[in-house]
């Protein structure tokens, strides 16, 4: 082994070291590029998922608002129907009483005169009954069973 062979070995080993360093640099560059690309894709995916979650949240809120509105509307319709039903029964009772009083006054030679007025949740009834020389005046205020 002479000096030529030893310098050839050192040149070869130096070339191998340079090539290994260069391959390592290329590999690190490729890995860095792949990692950055993966990071960009992950950021984009997280953004898409946040948008989808926001959309789902808005849709759930809108559905809740629609259901709540429907429940309130249904309750108000039921209350309206119930109050109207009671009001119609009360009016029917007033009409029946009026018919009987008129029939009675016609058959006893007296007369009944009166009126009724409905204000808000009150029924004001004013009746004047005359039978010959006797007279009776009735005024009554009845509160209707309307809940507010």
From Swiss-Prot:
Pfam families: IQ. Residues 11-40, 67-96 form the IQ domain. InterPro entries: IQ_motif_EF-hand-BS (IPR000048), IQCF (IPR039887). This is IQ domain-containing protein F5. The keyword DNA repair does not apply. Keywords: Repeat. It comes from Mus musculus (Mouse). The gene is Iqcf5. It comes from the Eukaryota.
